[in-house]
Amino acid sequence: MNKRTSVLTGLAALLFTLSSNSQTPPRPNANPGVNPVRLMDRSDVRVLRVELQPGAVRSVHVHNDVRYHLFIPVSGQIELSIGSAEPVTAAPGQAYYMEKGTPHGFRNVGSSPAIVVEVFAKDGA
């Protein structure tokens, strides 16, 4: 009975760990100084608030699980790369539209933290 209790406790701990990991931002250490926080995650839309420390880089990546993606700088100095175009300075208040699968990355080129809001319209919505 003691062994059975230990096995059940271990399984419960494993399930708890797996379910809690699925709710956390994706790989927070993959890009040091880049801190994403999910503000909303529904079947039709996902909204992230991303804080970037000075010099932090969000490496080039794609989103294949969304129809489109809006990138909206809120504060700071962001350099944004979209596809093969030259990087642009993304000023606060501007909005950038990206189709599904568009490679993009960004970095904080300023001396203070920068904040970006990302809105994703999910596939099937």
What does each of the following model-derived ranges do?
Residues 84-101:
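Short acidic-glycine-tyrosine-enriched beta hairpin
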Residues 64-79:
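Short, conserved beta-strand element in jelly-roll/cupin
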Residues 22-30:
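Cleaved targeting-peptide boundary
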Residues 101-125:
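Ligand-binding loop in jelly-roll beta-barrel domains
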Residues 9-17:
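Bacterial N-terminal signal peptides
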Residues 57-59, 79, 96, 100-106:
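Histidine-centered metal-chelating micro-motifs
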Residues 1-8:
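Bacterial N-terminal signal peptides that target proteins for export
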Residues 29-62, 66-67, 117-119, 123:
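A short glycine-rich, His/Asp/Glu-containing loop-to-beta-strand
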